[in-house]
Regions:
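Bilobed "Venus flytrap"/periplasmic-binding protein-like clamshell domains
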Residues: 31-34, 42-55, 118-157, 162, ...
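Extended ligand-binding regions for polar small-molecule ligands
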Residues: 46-58, 120-123, 135-136, 210-244
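A ligand-binding cleft/hinge motif common to bilobed small-molecule-binding domains
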Residues: 88-99, 173-205
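Short helices/loops that flank or line small-molecule/ion binding pockets
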Residues: 67, 72-85, 160-183, 187-188
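Extracytoplasmic small-molecule ligand-binding "clamshell" domains
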Residues: 21-97, 155
């Protein structure tokens, strides 16, 4: 009887550890980085949110989103091991020693590219960051930019206002993420018309986005890399990106089609 009782107790105690081992929680913040992470009305979506859901179907463990947190708290939770994944950041963005010692990095998932945009007919030669010396560049308040030591910032409160600033010639150029630009033009009809007033130039800066894995779950690095390779190879990743960066074509009303053929 005692042996049976002890066995039951052992199983009950071991069950939470088994559940924990079969689940990886990933960090989510309550600040948007469109179109990579979109936090709106308490709901989370975006390219990287969809990527994590796609990877969940490829792995034997369950990937579970944490409750959205302020960015610094999300990093604290990772450092403490309360979340075990962060998708997706460049290695250079997490150089704090306390973060470095608990971080393992996946293979690159995708690149994030910042491009320079110009008012129409006002492009200037650009080959390196030093070419921005003395220029006025439209930026978003609170964002960091490679090469900012060379140019004078003209801050806007958000990316929509930034596009307007460039279109109206209030700065000589602007710097914006390439996919963010495509997303804004595809999903915001109120600014889509401004595309003709903006000329896209070359890439200014490129970051390699990887999944950060907590060192306590090192055994998951190889399966994670294999899953990333699969969603890249089978087109899943490309389809996710297109979902957020290509305009949705309006579907014609069948009755309208038939009446127009009469």
């Amino acid at each position: 009887m005692n042996s049976w009782f002890m066995r039951v107790v052992f199983l009950l105690l071991a069950f939470p550890l088994t559940v924990q081992a079969s689940t990886l929680r990933y960090a989510v913040t309550n600040e948007s980085w469109e179109p990579y992470w979109i936090f709106r009305d308490g709901q989370v979506s975006g390219i990287l949110s969809d990527v994590m859901q796609a990877l969940d179907t490829q792995l034997e463990v369950t990937l579970e989103a944490d409750t959205p947190q302020p960015p610094l708290r999300a990093q604290k939770y990772f450092r403490e091991g309360l979340v075990q994944l962060e998708c997706c950041v460049d290695i250079e963005w997490r150089t704090d020693p306390e973060q470095v010692k608990v971080s393992l990095w996946s293979d690159p998932l995708m690149s994030s590219e910042e491009v320079i945009i110009f008012p129409p007919g006002r492009q200037f030669a650009f080959a390196k960051l030093q070419d921005l010396q003395g220029r006025t560049i439209s930026t978003v308040r609170g964002y960091g930019y490679a090469g900012s030591q060379y140019f004078a910032r003209v801050d806007s409160p958000n990316s929509t206002a930034q596009l307007n600033s460039v279109a109206l010639g209030r700065a000589e150029a602007g710097i914006i993420d390439r996919l963010e630009l495509a997303y804004l033009l595809a999903s915001h009809p109120e600014i889509g018309g401004r595309a003709v007033k903006i000329e896209q130039g070359p890439v200014v800066n490129r970051s390699e986005l990887r999944i950060r894995l907590h060192s306590s779950r090192a055994e998951m690095l190889q399966p994670l890399n294999a899953a990333i390779a699969r969603i890249r190879a089978d087109g899943t990743l490309s389809k996710i990106v297109q979902r957020y960066t290509q305009p949705v074509r309006p579907q014609l009303n069948p009755s309208a089609i038939s009446s127009s053929n009469r």
